[in-house]
Design a protein with these regions (language model features):
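Bacterial Sec-dependent N-terminal signal peptides
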Residues: 3, 12-40, 111-132
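Solvent-exposed, low-complexity, repeat-rich "mucin-like" stalks and linkers
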Residues: 35-67
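Short, solvent-exposed loop/turn segments enriched in Ser/Thr/Gly
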Residues: 48-55, 95-103
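Surface-exposed binding patches on compact interaction domains or structured appendages
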Residues: 58-87
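A short beta-strand micro-motif common to beta-rich folds, especially ectodomain repeats
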Residues: 88, 98-110
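Short, exposed coil/turn segments at beta-strand boundaries within extracellular/luminal domains
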Residues: 108-115, 303-308
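Flexible, low-complexity junctional segments that flank or bridge functional domains
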Residues: 125-367, 376, 382, 389-396
Length: 541
């Protein structure tokens, strides 16, 4: 009997212990292990775009958190923690036009899960601006065509920016596009950069088709081909001049009497200084409307300023023929020397350019001086025309240039560069053979400077690729071994042209690494052609 009572007591005790243990487990299952939380049960917390939300609580053990609904837009910046006072951080990077809710779950070891809700309030539908529309088109084009599109695709872009800021900020922020983004050290010791790629809003003026492929384009201009800023004097006291590189025939500048070499000291009565030089420079070379300027020239005779002369000029929409000047000097020690000043590779003027080479051929020129000092480039097809006419039959069937695109485009070409041949037999833009302008020269003399770039350098490189002797006279060239394929978009009656770098060019020998420029065979500074010592020139800008 005692044995039975003892056993009954033991079983009763064991049952009681088990019941107590089970009761504790049930309590934990109902208990979240969270105290002192900063949210209120049943009330949603508000979260907004780009503002991190922090919630706090005390955890009974280590914990993990997750987004159980709304994970496509709500992000946890903190996903786990340890026992004690804890903070959970959340963020949202996008907006929504309607209210949306996410649920956050916190699981503490050995306890039931807890959850709370966050709500992002909907905003009104954003007004789509013209900038946003053109930025979307530009973004799509750059993703496909930009030579360094791999890095470009990783950028976090703001389509709300103005179209120029959107374009230049994006490409300027990149690091792999060193052939586009040229760095330099300013006078203040800081590093700056220039981009070859650009975007522009085209003027609303009509064009006339003049060749088979390219239109002549009307553009506002004073008719000044280029400007060389020069500082004269001492470092403490000097005058900044705009030295005119040349003027286009029948232009406002030529009609006013301005000539190459004019030293402009005042613009609208103001001296040129470091604060206004950039604005004056671009306003004179690239006016975007009809505007008036009064230019004051310091008249220099025998190295002395003898007076001043004023010119009032008005920009107008015009076609600027890049064939500035050409002639032939005959019978110089048995040579007939052709001379061509060419300011830009404008394919719409290819007929005028080809006419010059036909004239050279008819006059049996034996030597050619090609003046590219102020030629910053243009259409590569026009570079092919010039190079082919110079080399003549020696160029037939040979590679003019070989193009490398971005990796995606190269994959479609089986990673083989795309070759373009010299256009001797057929030049598509004129629909004719170039034999009538073929000079068959063994060498060419090129006048070059630091503004000689792109298609100008392409002519040099392509001719050297077929072993034609190219003699460079002047200063080191720019070093632009890359080219562009532009696209135009019309948005709300405005037309934009986006011109990014899309390829690198190589010659027939596979050489294309001239990003530091071509060094001249004969060095000559045109502001001091005789290399005199102690002259008053300080520097060119």
């Amino acid at each position: 009997m005692k044995h039975v009572n003892y056993l009954s007591f033991f079983l009763l005790t064991l049952f009681s212990i088990s019941f107590i243990s089970c009761s504790d487990d049930d309590d934990n299952k109902l208990n979240t292990g969270i105290t002192n939380q900063s949210w209120t049960e049943g009330k949603s917390l508000e979260i907004s775009q780009d503002n991190e939300l922090s919630v706090s609580f005390n955890a009974a053990a280590k914990w993990v958190a997750s987004v159980t609904s709304g994970a496509d837009w709500c992000k946890l910046n903190t996903t786990s923690g340890t026992k004690g006072q804890s903070t959970l951080k959340l963020s949202v990077s996008t907006s929504s036009t309607t209210d949306r809710t996410a649920r956050i779950s916190i699981n503490i070891d050995g306890y039931s899960p807890a959850s709370f809700e966050v709500t992002q309030k909907g905003t009104s539908v954003p007004q789509t601006t013209e900038d946003m529309e053109i930025n979307a088109k530009v973004d799509e084009y750059l993703r496909e065509m930009y030579l360094w599109n791999d890095e470009y695709k990783t950028l976090n872009l703001d389509h709300n920016k103005g179209y120029e800021d959107f374009f230049y900020d994006a490409l300027g922020s990149m690091t792999t596009n060193t052939l586009d983004k040229k760095t330099y050290v300013g006078s203040d010791g800081k590093t700056y950069y220039n981009l070859f790629s650009y975007i522009q809003l085209l003027p609303n003026i009509s064009s006339t088709r003049t060749t088979k492929i390219v239109n002549k384009e009307l553009a506002y201009s004073f008719g000044i081909t280029g400007i060389t800023p020069i500082s004269i004097g001492t470092q403490a006291e000097n005058t900044i001049y705009f030295c005119l590189q040349g003027v286009y025939p029948d232009s406002p500048a030529s009609e006013a009497g301005l000539k190459r070499g004019a030293m402009i000291s005042l613009i609208n009565g103001k001296k040129i200084n470091n604060n206004n030089i950039n604005n004056f420079y671009y306003d004179i070379l690239l006016p975007d409307a009809t505007i008036n300027y009064t230019l004051t020239e310091d008249v220099v005779e025998g190295g002395t300023i003898t007076g001043q002369k004023e010119y009032t000029i008005t920009s107008k929409a015009t076609y600027n023929n890049p064939v500035i000047f050409s002639n032939v000097k005959e019978d110089i020690e048995g040579h007939r020397i052709g001379y061509l000043v060419y300011s830009g590779f404008e394919a719409s003027f290819d007929q005028e350019l080809f006419n010059v080479f036909k004239d050279f051929k008819n006059k049996n020129v034996t030597d050619l001086i090609l003046d590219l000092r102020y030629n910053g480039g243009g259409h590569t097809m026009s570079a092919n025309l010039i190079a082919t006419c110079i080399a003549g039959t020696a160029s037939q069937g040979k590679v003019f240039s070989s193009l490398r695109y971005n990796d995606e485009r190269m994959a479609k070409l089986n990673n083989k560069r795309e070759d373009e041949l010299f256009a001797y037999s057929s030049y598509p833009n004129l629909g004719t053979s170039l034999s009538a302008g073929s000079l068959n020269l063994p060498r060419v003399y090129c006048l070059v400077g630091n503004g000689t770039a792109s298609a100008s350098e392409l002519v040099i490189n392509s001719l050297e690729g077929i072993d034609l002797d190219v003699i460079l006279i002047g200063e080191k060239t720019t070093g632009k071994n890359v080219g562009m394929e532009y696209e135009e978009y019309t948005v709300r009656n405005n037309t934009y042209r986006v011109v990014p770098i899309t390829f690198q060019s190589y010659n027939a020998k596979g050489f294309g690494e001239y990003e530091k420029g071509f060094e001249p065979d004969i060095l000559m500074d045109e502001t001091n052609p005789y290399n005199e010592q102690g002259v008053f020139y300080i520097h060119k800008y």
